[in-house]
Design a protein with these regions (language model features):
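Outer membrane beta-barrel strand-and-loop segments of large Gram-negative receptors
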Residues: 439-443, 485-491, 604-606, 610, ...
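Short, acidic, small-residue-rich periplasmic hinge/interaction motif at the N-terminus
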Residues: 28, 40-44, 77-79, 91-135, ...
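N-terminal periplasmic accessory domains that precede
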Residues: 94-100, 142-145, 184-187, 201, ...
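Surface-exposed extracellular loop regions of Gram-negative outer-membrane beta-barrel proteins
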Residues: 411, 526, 537, 570-615, ...
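Face-selective signature of the C-terminal outer-membrane beta-barrel domain
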Residues: 3, 320-344, 375-534, 567-571, ...
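Outer-membrane beta-barrel translocator/receptor signature
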Residues: 196, 211-218, 226-283, 315-319
Length: 854
C-alpha cells in the first residue's frame, strides 16, 4: 500500500505540467496603484457570454489560470470599478496579463443600491456566511447568529449541533481557542456578532485539520481588514423581551471598532459591552411506571405522576475586547500578534413549581400521597476568558510557511442558592461550582507548489489542554450559614490531554478538469484524568477505583482523507470525499459534578466515556448560473461508540438522573440541498436550504457505574426519517431600505431513549441607511411566533416523560451603527484563520474553489 501511494504521488508530480499552460496576472487600482484583492477574473471563449473558467485575486492582487491552447478573453471586475478586458492567446507558453481598473462613479452609486451583498458563498467543500450581510446580526451575539445558519441548531442551553449532532468543533480563526462543550455556550452568547467577519461550515475537513468533531467544524473568522487607510465603526443597541414572566429590564450593547493600515504595519482594535436578558420556561410531565415505558404511554402501569412548571430569567453583562498588529518586516515576511479577552457576570433566576402524586391505577382520583413544593434558584457567576496568538508567515514564489503559538484560558465560577418551600417547611441550600481550563497550541504549516496545478502540504500540530472542576453543596439556615454538607454533590475532577499530530496532503489537477487530493494525519494522544467524590459518610473516594486503566490512556491513530472533484464546465462541478474523524469526550460529558437546580432531575457526567469514531462519505454537486446557485449533496456517517444522553430513575423512585453513554453505533444517510436565487432584478435574494436524512441508533444493553453503584441500561434501537427546511429572504425596497425574513422548520427526530418533537421559528429584520451608508439603523424581531422551544418524549425502565424547555421568549431589538474613516477604500479581504476549504483549494486559479457569491 505504501509503495502504491508513493508511486501515485510521483506520477502526479511528473505528469502535471503537460496538461495546460499558465496565465498569470495582477489587478491594481489605476489611481492608487494598490493591489485589488478578491477581484473577479473571468475567462470567455468565442462568442459564448458564459465564462468557461474563473478565479479571484489573492491578497497581492495576483491570479493564476491554467488554460489549454487557444484564444480567450479575460475580464477583470470589482465592485465600484469599470470592468476591463484583455485578449490573450495561449500556445504552450506562459502568458502574463495586467489589469488597471478605474473607479466608476456611476457604478459606485449602483453599488449602493445592491450594497446588501451576499450573505452566503458556496464552495464544493464548505459554505461561507458573511455576518455583516445578515440584518439579524445587528446587536446580536454569535450564538444568535448561528441559529440562522442552515444545518446548524442552537438549543435552549446554548448547545450547538451540526446536521443533527453535537459532535461539532467550534474554532476561532482556524484554532480550537479553548472552546469545548462545557464553556462554548457561555462564550458565544457573550461574543458580539459584530466582531465576526464570516462563519465557515466545513462538514468534512481534510487531514490538514484536527479530526475532532465527527460532524465537522464551524470556524468563526474574526474581522481584520487590511485595506489602506484608517476606518472603524461605533455601534449601540437595545433589546427587550416581549413575553417576560418577570418584569425584566431591557438588554443593551455598545461597541467600538477601529482598523488601520500604515504600510509596513496594520492593526485593529475592538471593544464592546453587552448586557443580555432573556426569559423562558419549562414544563415536565413524568409518569413513574411499574414496568418499562414505550413511545405510547401505558396508563395501566402508572404508580405516580410528577407535574412541573418553571419560569427562568437570565441576565448578565460582559466586556469583550480584541486587538491585533501585523508587522510586514520584509517582502514576504509577516509577524502578527493578536488576542481577545472577555469577562462576564451571568445571573440566573429560576422558579419551579412541582406536584408529585402517588396512586394506583384504580384510585387515581384519591392519591395516597400528594407532594407539592416550589424551588427557587438564584445564581451568580463570574466568567473570564481569553486567547493570545503570536504567528509568523513567510511567502516566496511557490513556498509558504506559517508558524504560530496560541494560549487560551477560560474560567467559570458560580454560586447558586436554592430555597425550597413545601407546605409550612422551608429549606435552604447552595451549590458552589468552580472550573478552569487552559490550553496551548504550537503548529507549523508548510506549503509547496511544484507546479501551478499541484500542491504539497505538511505540518506539525502540538496541543496541550488542562482543566479542573470543583463543586460542593450544603444545607443552610435562613441567614445563609452552612449547617451540613451534602456529600453526594461533592466532586473534584481534573484532566490533562496532550496531542502530537503530523500531517501531509498532496493534490493535483489533470486535463484542466479532474482534481485529486489525498491526505494522512497521524496523532499520538495522551490523557490523564483524576476524579473524586464523597461517600455517604463524607470520605473522599476515587471515581476510578478498580478502573485505573481508564485513568491514563495513550494511543497512536491515523486519520486519512481523500477528495476527487471533476469540473464539467459551464458551472457544473462534482466532488466525492472521505474522512475519518473522532469525538473524544471532554468537558461536561465526563465531569461527575451533579447539578441539582431541579431536585427531581439531576444531571452529571460519565467518567467512563470512550472516544467515538466516524467514517464520513460525501458526494457534493455545485452548479452556478449568472443569478442562481445550486448546491446539492449526499452524506453518509457511520459512528462507533456515539455518545448519547441517557435517563434513568434513581432508587428512591422520585428522582430522575441524566448522564452520557457510548451507544453501539449510529448511522445517518441524508441529502442536503441549498439554493440561492436573485429574483426580480436586485429586489429579492432567496436562500433555501433543506436536509433530509435517515437516522439509526442501535440498541444498548450494558452496565454503567456511578459513585460506586452499578446501573443497568437497556435502550431499544431507534430509527426515523427526518428533515429540516430553512428559508432566508432579503428584500431591497429602496436604495437605502432593506428587509429580511428567516423561517425554519425541523421535523421530529430520534434520540437514544425517545423522540424530539418538531420545531419552527420566524425572525424579521429591517435596515435603513443614511449619510451615504455611514449611518445604519436596524430593527429586529426574534421568534415572532414565540415558538422556539425544545419538546422531548423520553421513556425507559420505570418512566415515561414529556418535557418542554424554552430558553428565550419573543424579543425586539434596535441597533444604530456609525461607520467612519476611509470606508470607500474598504474591500473584502482574506482573513487569517480562513480554513480555505475542506479539501484545500489546491489550485490557486480557483478552479476547485468555485466562488459562487453574488
Amino acid at each position: 500500500m505504501k509503495k502504491l501511494f508513493s508511486t501515485l504521488l510521483l506520477l502526479l508530480v511528473i505528469s502535471a505540467p503537460i496538461f495546460a499552460a499558465q496565465v498569470t496576472g495582477k489587478v491594481i487600482d489605476a489611481g492608487t496603484k494598490q493591489a485589488i484583492d478578491f477581484a473577479n477574473v473571468s475567462v470567455l471563449k468565442g462568442s459564448d457570454p458564459a465564462p468557461v473558467k474563473g478565479t479571484v485575486t489573492d491578497e497581492k492582487g495576483e491570479f493564476v489560470l491554467d488554460l489549454a491552447d487557444g484564444s480567450y478573453t479575460l475580464v477583470a471586475s470589482f465592485m465600484g470599478y469599470s470592468e476591463q478586458k484583455r485578449e490573450v492567446t495561449v500556445a504552450g507558453k506562459p502568458v502574463q496579463v495586467r489589469f488597471a481598473l478605474r473607479e466608476d462613479s456611476k457604478m459606485l452609486q449602483d453599488v449602493e443600491v445592491v450594497g446588501q451583498g451576499s450573505s452566503m458563498r458556496f464552495e464544493l467543500d464548505k459554505k461561507v456566511f458573511t455576518v455583516d450581510q445578515n440584518i439579524a446580526s445587528a446587536g446580536a451575539s454569535v450564538s444568535e447568529v448561528l441559529e440562522n445558519i442552515p444545518s446548524v441548531e442552537v438549543d435552549q442551553e446554548g448547545n450547538i449541533s451540526l446536521r443533527n449532532s453535537e459532535d461539532v468543533e467550534i474554532w476561532i480563526n482556524g484554532k480550537p481557542a479553548g472552546l469545548n462543550s462545557e464553556n462554548r455556550g457561555q462564550v458565544l452568547q457573550q461574543m458580539p456578532a459584530g466582531t465576526i467577519e464570516k462563519i465557515e461550515l466545513i462538514t468534512n475537513p481534510s487531514a490538514k485539520y484536527s479530526p475532532e468533531g465527527t460532524s465537522g467544524i464551524i470556524n468563526l473568522v474574526m474581522k481584520k481588514d487590511r485595506a489602506a487607510g484608517f476606518y472603524g465603526s461605533v455601534q449601540a443597541g437595545i433589546n427587550y423581551a416581549l413575553a417576560a414572566p418577570w418584569t425584566t429590564p431591557p438588554g443593551a450593547n455598545v461597541g467600538f471598532n477601529i482598523n488601520f493600515n500604515a504600510g509596513p504595519v496594520d492593526g485593529y482594535f475592538n471593544v464592546g459591552y453587552r448586557y443580555h436578558t432573556s426569559n423562558g420556561g419549562s414544563i415536565t410531565d413524568r409518569y413513574n411506571l411499574d414496568g418499562t415505558g414505550s413511545e405510547k404511554l401505558d396508563s395501566t402501569l402508572i404508580n405516580s405522576h410528577l407535574t412541573q412548571e418553571g419560569q427562568q430569567s437570565h441576565r448578565g453583562g460582559g466586556m469583550f475586547g480584541r486587538a491585533g498588529l501585523n508587522f510586514h518586516v520584509a517582502q514576504g515576511h509577516t509577524i502578527g500578534v493578536s488576542g481577545f479577552g472577555m469577562v462576564s457576570d451571568p445571573k440566573v433566576f429560576n422558579s419551579i413549581n412541582s406536584n408529585h402524586r402517588t396512586y394506583t391505577f384504580t384510585d387515581r382520583l384519591n392519591p395516597a400521597n400528594n407532594r407539592e413544593f416550589t424551588r427557587d434558584q438564584n445564581g451568580n457567576a463570574y466568567h473570564p476568558g481569553g486567547m493570545a496568538t503570536l504567528d509568523y508567515t513567510f511567502e516566496q514564489d511557490a513556498h509558504k510557511l506559517y508558524v504560530s503559538g496560541t494560549y487560551n484560558n477560560f474560567g467559570f465560577n458560580m454560586l447558586t442558592g436554592y430555597t425550597q418551600i413545601e407546605g409550612v417547611d422551608t429549606t435552604y441550600q447552595d451549590q458552589n461550582s468552580l472550573s478552569n481550563g487552559q490550553g496551548i497550541e504550537v503548529k507549523a504549516d508548510y506549503e509547496w507548489k511544484p507546479t501551478p496545478q499541484s500542491r504539497l502540504e505538511a505540518g506539525y500540530d502540538y496541543t496541550r489542554n488542562w482543566s479542573n472542576s470543583f463543586a460542593d453543596a450544603h444545607n443552610n439556615n435562613a441567614e445563609g450559614a452552612h449547617i451540613n454538607e451534602l456529600f453526594p454533590y461533592y466532586s473534584d475532577a481534573s484532566g490533562l490531554t496532550q496531542n502530537h499530530a503530523f500531517y501531509v496532503t498532496y493534490g493535483n489537477r489533470f486535463w484542466d478538469k479532474l482534481s485529486i487530493q489525498v491526505g494522512l494525519r497521524g496523532e499520538y494522544y495522551m490523557r490523564h484524568l483524576e476524579s473524586f467524590y464523597k461517600d455517604k459518610d463524607g470520605n473522599v473516594q476515587d471515581s476510578y477505583a478498580g478502573m485505573e486503566n481508564k485513568k491514563d490512556t495513550s494511543y497512536f491513530q491515523l486519520f486519512p482523507s481523500a477528495y476527487i472533484s471533476y469540473d464539467f464546465g459551464n458551472g457544473h462541478e462534482l466532488q466525492l470525499n472521505y474522512t475519518r474523524r473522532v469525538n473524544r469526550p471532554w468537558g461536561h460529558q465526563i465531569n461527575p459534578r451533579m447539578d441539582f437546580s431541579d431536585s427531581t432531575n439531576i444531571s452529571y457526567g460519565n467518567v467512563n466515556l470512550l472516544p467515538a469514531y466516524s467514517n464520513n462519505l460525501e458526494l457534493n454537486y455545485l452548479k452556478t448560473w449568472e443569478r442562481h446557485t445550486l448546491s446539492a449533496g449526499v452524506f453518509w456517517k457511520y459512528r462507533e461508540g456515539a455518545v448519547q444522553n441517557v435517563k434513568y430513575m434513581d432508587s428512591d423512585g422520585r428522582t430522575m438522573k441524566n448522564t452520557y453513554l457510548n451507544v453501539a453505533t449510529r448511522q445517518e444517510l441524508g441529502v442536503e440541498v441549498v439554493a440561492k436565487n436573485r429574483l426580480f432584478g436586485e429586489l429579492l435574494q432567496l436562500t433555501t436550504s433543506a436536509n433530509f436524512y435517515w437516522n439509526n441508533i442501535s440498541a444498548v444493553d450494558q452496565e454503567m457505574y456511578h459513585l460506586g453503584d452499578t446501573i443497568p441500561v437497556h435502550l431499544p434501537g431507534q430509527n426515523i426519517f427526518a428533515g429540516s427546511v430553512r428559508v432566508n429572504a432579503q428584500f431591497l425596497f429602496t436604495k437605502n431600505f432593506s428587509g429580511q425574513i428567516t423561517a425554519a422548520y425541523r421535523s421530529p427526530r430520534v434520540v437514544a431513549q425517545g423522540t424530539t418533537s418538531h420545531s419552527y421559528s420566524l425572525d424579521l429584520g429591517l435596515r435603513y441607511t443614511l449619510l451615504n451608508k455611514q449611518l445604519a439603523l436596524a430593527l429586529n424581531v426574534r421568534d415572532v411566533l414565540d415558538s422556539r422551544a425544545r419538546r422531548n418524549i423520553t421513556w425507559g425502565d420505570g418512566f415515561w416523560q414529556f418535557s418542554e424547555n424554552r430558553w428565550h421568549s419573543r424579543s425586539v431589538s434596535f441597533t444604530i451603527t456609525y461607520n467612519f474613516g476611509n470606508q470607500r477604500g474598504r474591500r473584502p479581504n482574506r482573513q487569517d484563520g480562513d480554513l480555505g476549504g475542506a479539501g484545500d483549494d489546491f489550485d490557486d486559479s480557483g478552479n476547485t474553489n468555485t466562488d459562487s457569491s453574488f
